[in-house]
């Protein structure tokens, strides 16, 4: 049956030992196992098989695009089974529905002079004559109006119902102003929330700095071991409520909050004293207190509309009233300085030292620069928690 198998053939297409059931390898159609042709089971030498070059002419068939077997035994011998595409003529587009139903195009409207000739006769002369009728006049002009000059248009129901205060024909509301009016408070709220979140981090940062002063080698790990509720290792500045060190952390942060409130109060007093809103009577020269009595009253107010006095009357030992002017700025600071100078005489030497430092301004500036260069990084790490307070202080200083 067939040619002898002992003949030596080379190449992948001449190797009969390679199974080729579907004929996708070169010079093979079907393996003899399928027995497609009983007269010649050796399909490598079957003369009835289709030639291999014809197998290259494949197209869209039963196996999808470009995946059609090169024979027709499985799918048939039709052009579709062999992958040959047949182009069918496309059907013409359907005609318009209006044309099929017999509808004609809409005719062009005739001019107004043909359809409504009476409207063309209504010229300005007829209009002014019609205005002589009170009923027609009331439709175009409000009460008390005239037909000459600029007129207010007749109010409409829409304008009356929409806005009582606005007139018909008035300018429309500017949406840009409305948008800016809404975005302004939103920007302020965003800035306040940002500063609030930064301020809330101040106690934690100061707590870490405070704790680091006790442990120069770095913050230790809090074991947090408790007989009732053991916890994992953590920093002493972030103790959970179950840790024994939690109460000490709360105490430290409470003291830090009091310190921040004291700092804000001092800043507020300095600001009010700078603006002259703290009218404090100064001390008399040579005395430590101002005498009490009916003479210690303000005799003159400050210039302008200010509600703060400008001077105070004091009664010294000789019995004569003396009017002492109140400084327009730093009244409380000068009072405290005079009171401290009267109590501590060595403060007068400090004034001379400050004046001497001011006289040596280049040297002082070099000293300050050297101190900042040497202690600057440490100062920045210490003062960094207070940076969120600076914008608030600057805003209050400018606004008040």
UniProtKB/Swiss-Prot annotation:
<feature type="glycosylation site" description="N-linked (GlcNAc...) asparagine; by host">
    <location>
        <position position="320"/>
    </location>
</feature>
<dbReference type="GO" id="GO:0039654">
    <property type="term" value="P:fusion of virus membrane with host endosome membrane"/>
</dbReference>
<keyword id="KW-1133">Transmembrane helix</keyword>
<feature type="topological domain" description="Intravirion">
    <location>
        <begin position="370"/>
        <end position="375"/>
    </location>
</feature>
<feature type="transmembrane region" description="Helical; Name=TM1; Note=In external conformation">
    <location>
        <begin position="182"/>
        <end position="202"/>
    </location>
</feature>
<protein>
    <recommendedName>
        <fullName>Large envelope protein</fullName>
    </recommendedName>
</protein>
<dbReference type="GO" id="GO:0019062">
    <property type="term" value="P:virion attachment to host cell"/>
</dbReference>
<feature type="region of interest" description="Disordered">
    <location>
        <begin position="84"/>
        <end position="110"/>
    </location>
</feature>
<feature type="topological domain" description="Virion surface">
    <location>
        <begin position="275"/>
        <end position="348"/>
    </location>
</feature>
<keyword id="KW-0449">Lipoprotein</keyword>
<keyword id="KW-0519">Myristate</keyword>
<keyword id="KW-0472">Membrane</keyword>
<feature type="transmembrane region" description="Helical; Name=TM2">
    <location>
        <begin position="254"/>
        <end position="274"/>
    </location>
</feature>
<keyword id="KW-1164">Virus endocytosis by host</keyword>
<comment type="function">
    <text>The large envelope protein exists in two topological conformations, one which is termed 'external' or Le-HBsAg and the other 'internal' or Li-HBsAg. In its external conformation the protein attaches the virus to cell receptors and thereby initiating infection. This interaction determines the species specificity and liver tropism. This attachment induces virion internalization predominantly through caveolin-mediated endocytosis. The large envelope protein also assures fusion between virion membrane and endosomal membrane.</text>
</comment>
<dbReference type="InterPro" id="IPR000349">
    <property type="entry name" value="HBV_HBSAG"/>
</dbReference>
<keyword id="KW-1170">Fusion of virus membrane with host endosomal membrane</keyword>
<feature type="transmembrane region" description="Helical">
    <location>
        <begin position="349"/>
        <end position="369"/>
    </location>
</feature>
<keyword id="KW-1162">Viral penetration into host cytoplasm</keyword>
<dbReference type="GO" id="GO:0055036">
    <property type="term" value="C:virion membrane"/>
</dbReference>
<feature type="compositionally biased region" description="Polar residues">
    <location>
        <begin position="96"/>
        <end position="109"/>
    </location>
</feature>
<feature type="topological domain" description="Virion surface; in external conformation">
    <location>
        <begin position="2"/>
        <end position="181"/>
    </location>
</feature>
<dbReference type="Pfam" id="PF00695">
    <property type="entry name" value="vMSA"/>
</dbReference>
<feature type="region of interest" description="Pre-S2">
    <location>
        <begin position="120"/>
        <end position="174"/>
    </location>
</feature>
<comment type="function">
    <text>The middle envelope protein plays an important role in the budding of the virion. It is involved in the induction of budding in a nucleocapsid independent way. In this process the majority of envelope proteins bud to form subviral lipoprotein particles of 22 nm of diameter that do not contain a nucleocapsid.</text>
</comment>
<keyword id="KW-0007">Acetylation</keyword>
<keyword id="KW-1161">Viral attachment to host cell</keyword>
<keyword id="KW-1166">Caveolin-mediated endocytosis of virus by host</keyword>
<feature type="topological domain" description="Intravirion; in external conformation">
    <location>
        <begin position="203"/>
        <end position="253"/>
    </location>
</feature>
<keyword id="KW-0261">Viral envelope protein</keyword>
<feature type="topological domain" description="Intravirion; in internal conformation">
    <location>
        <begin position="2"/>
        <end position="253"/>
    </location>
</feature>
<feature type="lipid moiety-binding region" description="N-myristoyl glycine; by host">
    <location>
        <position position="2"/>
    </location>
</feature>
<feature type="region of interest" description="Pre-S1">
    <location>
        <begin position="2"/>
        <end position="119"/>
    </location>
</feature>
<keyword id="KW-1160">Virus entry into host cell</keyword>
<dbReference type="GO" id="GO:0016020">
    <property type="term" value="C:membrane"/>
</dbReference>
<keyword id="KW-0812">Transmembrane</keyword>
<dbReference type="GO" id="GO:0019031">
    <property type="term" value="C:viral envelope"/>
</dbReference>
<feature type="topological domain" description="Virion surface">
    <location>
        <begin position="399"/>
        <end position="400"/>
    </location>
</feature>
<keyword id="KW-0946">Virion</keyword>
<feature type="region of interest" description="Pre-S">
    <location>
        <begin position="2"/>
        <end position="174"/>
    </location>
</feature>
<keyword id="KW-1168">Fusion of virus membrane with host membrane</keyword>
<dbReference type="GO" id="GO:0075513">
    <property type="term" value="P:caveolin-mediated endocytosis of virus by host cell"/>
</dbReference>
């Amino acid at each position: 049956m067939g040619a002898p198998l002992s003949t030596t053939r080379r190449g992948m297409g001449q190797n009969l030992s390679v199974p080729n059931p579907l004929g996708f390898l070169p010079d093979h159609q079907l393996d003899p196992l399928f027995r497609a042709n009983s007269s010649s089971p050796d399909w490598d030498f079957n003369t009835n098989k289709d030639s291999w070059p014809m197998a290259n002419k494949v197209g869209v068939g039963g196996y999808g695009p470009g995946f059609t077997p090169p024979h027709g035994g499985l799918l048939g011998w039709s052009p579709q089974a062999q992958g040959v595409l047949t182009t069918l003529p496309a059907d013409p587009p359907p005609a318009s529905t209006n044309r099929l139903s017999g509808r004609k195009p809409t005719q062009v409207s005739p001019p107004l002079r043909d359809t409504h000739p009476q409207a063309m006769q209504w010229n300005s002369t007829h209009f002014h004559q019609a205005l002589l009728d009170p009923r027609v006049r009331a439709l175009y002009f409000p009460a008390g109006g005239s037909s000459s000059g600029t007129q207010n248009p007749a109010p409409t129901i829409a304008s009356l119902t929409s806005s009582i205060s606005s007139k018909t024909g008035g300018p429309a509301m500017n949406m840009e102003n409305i948008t800016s009016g809404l975005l302004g408070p939103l920007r302020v709220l965003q800035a306040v929330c940002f500063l609030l979140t930064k301020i809330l981090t101040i106690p934690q940062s100061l707590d870490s700095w405070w704790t680091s002063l006790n442990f120069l080698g770095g913050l230790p790990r809090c074991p947090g071991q408790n007989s009732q509720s053991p916890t994992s290792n953590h920093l002493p500045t972030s103790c959970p409520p179950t840790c024994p060190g939690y109460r000490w952390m709360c105490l430290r942060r409470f003291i830090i909050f009091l310190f921040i409130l004291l700092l804000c109060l001092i800043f507020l007093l300095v600001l009010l004293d700078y603006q002259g809103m703290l009218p404090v009577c100064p001390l008399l020269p040579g005395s430590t207190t101002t005498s009490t009595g009916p003479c210690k009253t303000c005799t003159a107010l400050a210039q302008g509309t200010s509600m703060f006095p400008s001077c105070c009357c004091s009664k010294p030992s000789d019995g004569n009233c003396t009017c002492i002017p109140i400084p327009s700025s730093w009244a409380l600071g000068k009072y405290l300085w005079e009171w401290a100078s009267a109590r501590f005489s060595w403060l007068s030497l400090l004034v001379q030292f400050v004046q001497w430092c001011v006289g040596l301004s280049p040297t002082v500036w070099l000293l300050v620069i050297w101190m900042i260069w040497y202690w600057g990084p440490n100062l920045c790490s210490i003062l960094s928690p207070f940076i969120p307070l600076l914008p608030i202080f600057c805003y209050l200083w400018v606004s008040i």
